[in-house]
Structure formats: C-alpha cells, structure tokens
UniProtKB/Swiss-Prot annotation:
GO terms for cellular component: cytosol; nucleus. It comes from the Eukaryota. Belongs to the URM1 family. This is Ubiquitin-related modifier 1. GO terms for biological process: protein urmylation; tRNA wobble position uridine thiolation. CDD domains: Ubl_Urm1. GO terms for molecular function: protein tag activity. It is found in: Cytoplasm. It comes from Schizosaccharomyces pombe (strain 972 / ATCC 24843) (Fission yeast). HAMAP family: Urm1. C-terminal thiocarboxylation occurs in 2 steps, it is first acyl-adenylated (-COAMP) via the hesA/moeB/thiF part of UBA4, then thiocarboxylated (-COSH) via the rhodanese domain of UBA4. The lineage of its organism: Eukaryota, Fungi, Dikarya, Ascomycota, Taphrinomycotina. Pathway: tRNA modification; 5-methoxycarbonylmethyl-2-thiouridine-tRNA biosynthesis. There is a cross-link at residue 97 (Glycyl lysine isopeptide (Gly-Lys) (interchain with K-? in acceptor proteins)). SUPFAM superfamilies: MoaD/ThiS.
C-alpha cells in the first residue's frame, strides 16, 4: 500500500530537495500517522537537522500537517490510520527574515 508525501515551505531542503515522496506503508511498521512522522525524521538527509522537523516525538510547532487536504487536528493527529492512496502534506510556516 502506497501513500504520497509532499514537503512544502522549504521542508524539502531537509529531505535532499525532494518535494514529493511515494512511500509504502509496509516500510513504516504501522499505519499510524505517528509512524510516518518517525520514519520521516529518520530519513532526514543531515541528522543534525532532525530537530527542524520533529520535537518531542511529533512535528514541531509551525509545521502544518494535512491528510487528503484536511488538517490533521481534525483526524486524531498521530493516531490517524493511513490508508492506501492517502496524501500527506507537511508545510513549514517557519521562515527567516
């Protein structure tokens, strides 16, 4: 079972400049959205930048998570069960200036 992940707002820079990924749910070990977040943190190109994506076991404040265009806050957050064909978008609202 595959899902699509998009990385917007500069998050692609943490993932070798990949703006979109296709991932197999079997690679995550669980169908929970929290497992996807853990997996994404593990594949960050530079481990020293992990804290730019994850904080205390979840995405850091300032990163919006959408599942099939719905805010994850409405979908049980980390407990949401991913399904075949789901599209998960991570959007960073944190910008320098």
């Amino acid at each position: 079972m595959a899902i699509k992940v998009e990385l917007l707002g500069g998050l692609d820079l943490l993932f070798n400049k990949q703006k979109a990924l296709s991932l197999s749910l079997s690679n995550l070990g669980s169908t929970k959205l929290g497992s996807l977040i853990d997996y994404m943190a593990q594949i960050i190109e530079k481990p020293s930048q992990k804290d730019l994506f994850i904080l205390n076991g979840t995405v850091r404040p300032g990163i919006i998570v959408l599942v099939n265009d719905q805010d994850w806050e409405l979908l049980e957050k980390e407990e949401y069960n991913l399904e075949e064909g789901d599209e998960v978008v991570f959007v960073s609202t944190l910008h320098g200036g």
